[in-house]
Design a protein with these regions (language model features):
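Conserved N-terminal beta1-alpha1 strand-loop-helix module at the mouth
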Residues: 1-80, 88-92, 99-107, 117-127, ...
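A short, flexible beta-alpha/helix-coil linker loop
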Residues: 36-37, 135-139
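Short gly/ser/thr-rich secondary-structure transition/capping motifs
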Residues: 110-114
Length: 158
């Protein structure tokens, strides 16, 4: 299992310091939540931050796109190492994951707490990682949804 620290709670002015803390702690990955204010209610970082971070760090940049129609924006995140899209955010999940792979990146898919694992069956051959949301996405301070643990167990058995 890999535990990846997230930048979501970072103030934009503290990003550089938080990256340093992550490196000093010995972590190799950095999770960057991208939110559009439409798929989820909040807004956050964009592709420019990912490009700027890639120039300044050798951390693996794991970008989580919580945006509608991610297939229209994947190119903006070409400097990420891993790009994860939500199953619920696109009608073209297979094409979206192929687009990520064509950039030479690892492809991930996220599922919301209410989405069953079997919804991913057709794309398992393209997926390098699955992100099981254990909270409703897009809001800070959400309560952990215990029933999502069953999905993690189910995925480990596949």
């Amino acid at each position: 299992m890999i535990i990846v620290p997230s930048l979501l709670n970072s103030n934009i002015y503290d990003v550089q310091e938080n990256v340093k803390i992550t490196k000093d702690a010995g972590d190799n990955y950095l999770h960057i939540d991208v939110m559009d204010g439409s798929f989820v209610p909040m807004q956050s970082f964009g592709g420019k931050l990912v490009t700027d971070l890639k120039k300044k760090t050798n951390l693996v940049l794991d970008v989580h796109l919580m945006i509608n129609n991610p297939e229209l924006h994947i190119e903006e995140y070409r400097d990420a190492d891993i790009i994860t899209v939500h199953q619920e955010s696109t009608k073209q999940l297979y094409n979206c994951l192929n687009q990520i792979k064509k950039l030479g990146k690892k492809a991930g898919v996220a599922i919301n707490p209410g989405t069953p694992v079997h919804m991913l069956t057709d794309v398992f051959d393209l997926v390098d990682q699955v992100l099981v949301m254990t909270v409703n996405p897009g809001m800070l301070g959400e309560s952990f949804i215990k029933s999502t643990l069953k999905k993690i167990v189910e995925l480990k058995q596949i």
